[in-house]
Amino acid sequence: MAHPSQLGFQDAASPVMEELLHFHDHALMIVFLISTLVLYIIAATASTKLTDKYILDSQEIEVIWTIMPAVILILIALPSLRILYLMDEINDPHLTVKTMGHQWYWSYEYTDYDDLSFDSYMIPTQDLTPGQFRLLETDHRMVIPVDSPIRVLVSAEDVLHSWAVPSLGIKMDAVPGRLNQTAFIVSRPGVFYGQCSEICGANHSFMPIVVEAVPLEHFENWSSLMLEDA
């Protein structure tokens, strides 16, 4: 999760987020090389005493500055398109969770079970226990199994919301009257935090998201207990 004075991304917990981190490094290297080249040209132009005001055009230069940007854009676009298709692909999900945004909390429904649903509210600061995080903890976590394809259906009851978990590389808009979907695989056990990422009113900052990834047998025990309490 995020920590104070952090300059980079959160640690990846899904294959999609790992791909996004690699793409970020790839694009950043291209931007760094372009910036270095431009600064060198500016410095060389400002410091040289050689001038030629009689050159009105140059076919060679025009070809170069047309082809080079096209090649650079292709180098950025191809891996970007690959990740976009990867993020949109949903193959045989083992579990489907319907997520609804409300002012100002989230509700979760496990559609593969008859009656497994709950609301998830932020824990107030005065009720936190040592080790819990302010404005990030909830009274009920979204519990899912590790290494299993998970499909999340996202919508909203009232206004626009956005279900986002940075460590998983997910940000899906919750639109009233529309059902969006995304899929992911959590590659390691852990607790992953997110927040509503669409301004939705006075308490927009107080509707956190907590995803807990556990081994399959632990998930089965948790779901059995939740069904017994329902």
From Swiss-Prot:
Ranges that cross the membrane: 15-45, 60-87
Free-text remark on how the cofactor is bound: Binds a dinuclear copper A center per subunit.
Localization per Swiss-Prot or TrEMBL: Mitochondrion inner membrane
Entries under InterPro entries matching the protein: CcO_II, CcO_II-like_C, CcO_II_C, Copper_CuA, Cupredoxin, Cyt_c_oxidase_su2, Cyt_c_oxidase_su2_TM_dom, Cyt_c_oxidase_su2_TM_sf
Keyword line: Copper, Electron transport, Magnesium, Membrane, Metal-binding, Mitochondrion, Mitochondrion inner membrane, Respiratory chain, Translocase, Transmembrane, Transmembrane helix, Transport
Residues annotated as binding Cu cation A2: C196, E198, C200, H204
Required cofactor(s): Cu cation
Enzyme Commission (EC) number: 7.1.1.9
One GO molecular-function entry: cytochrome-c oxidase activity
GO biological process entries: ATP synthesis coupled electron transport
Residues in compartment: Mitochondrial matrix: 46-59
Record's bilayer topology term: Multi-pass membrane protein
Subunit text: Component of the cytochrome c oxidase (complex IV, CIV), a multisubunit enzyme composed of 14 subunits. The complex is composed of a catalytic core of 3 subunits MT-CO1, MT-CO2 and MT-CO3, encoded in the mitochondrial DNA, and 11 supernumerary subunits COX4I, COX5A, COX5B, COX6A, COX6B, COX6C, COX7A, COX7B, COX7C, COX8 and NDUFA4, which are encoded in the nuclear genome.
Alphabetized PANTHER family for the sequence: CYTOCHROME C OXIDASE SUBUNIT 2, CYTOCHROME C OXIDASE, SUBUNIT II
Listed name of the protein: Cytochrome c oxidase subunit 2
